[in-house]
């Protein structure tokens, strides 16, 4: 490809195809190569970070997301992804909340960022704040992963039947959702 935009488009298409068929190591390798060629392309860097996360390369994911934020300080997806990852791993929760707060400032009302805020509040032990965020996120977008989080908060608060109802809704939309499956297994819910 003589034109850089053509080369970039080809690399993006290749990584997308590999990701669709769940060949994550190969998709990751394509993105690493793409980022060597286009080192300041924040969209490619963000995609590399997401593939690194799929491969449990959390150090790489965190480093690359911080690079994205440095290059593009208004990249709310990078703030959210980094904050959510910290919350999911239950580490550096005050930092996670601050990253997610910044993402919400940039994209107020985004249901996925609102979900992340609910999740970090839950990890911090703030169940009522978590519930408020997660109910708002779920009302805005009844996504299966949001259902998993909302159900877990309801479960922890003793609202077991409501949790089961939310999980059933989530399962009816996406029975194979990894986050929901893991949540139900961990909490030993049938």
Question: Residue ranges of each PLM-predicted region?
Answer:
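Register position in tetratricopeptide repeats
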Residues: 20, 54-55, 88-89, 123, ...
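Residue-level recognition of tetratricopeptide repeat
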Residues: 6-7, 16, 41, 50, 75, 84-85, 110, 119, ...
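TPR alpha-solenoid repeat register
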Residues: 9-10, 44, 78, 113, ...
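Structural marker of alpha-solenoid helical repeat scaffolds
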Residues: 2-5, 37-38, 71, 106, ...
């Amino acid at each position: 490809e003589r034109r850089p935009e053509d080369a970039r488009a080809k690399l993006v298409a290749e990584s997308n195809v590999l990701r669709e068929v769940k060949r994550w190591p190969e998709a990751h390798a394509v993105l690493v190569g793409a980022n060597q060629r286009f080192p300041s392309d924040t969209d490619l860097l963000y995609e590399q970070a997401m593939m690194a996360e799929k491969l449990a390369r959390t150090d790489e994911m965190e480093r690359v997301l911080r690079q994205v934020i440095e290059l593009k300080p208004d990249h709310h997806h990078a703030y959210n992804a980094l904050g959510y990852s910290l919350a999911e791993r239950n580490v550096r929760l005050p930092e996670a909340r601050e990253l997610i707060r910044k993402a919400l400032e940039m994209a107020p009302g985004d249901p996925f960022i609102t979900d992340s805020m609910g999740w970090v509040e839950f990890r911090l032990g703030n169940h009522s704040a978590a519930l408020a965020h997660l109910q708002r996120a779920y009302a805005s977008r009844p996504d299966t992963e949001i259902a998993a989080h909302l159900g877990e908060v309801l479960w922890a608060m003793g609202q077991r039947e409501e949790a089961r109802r939310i999980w059933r809704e989530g399962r009816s939309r996406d029975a194979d959702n990894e986050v929901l499956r893991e949540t139900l297994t961990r909490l030993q819910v049938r």
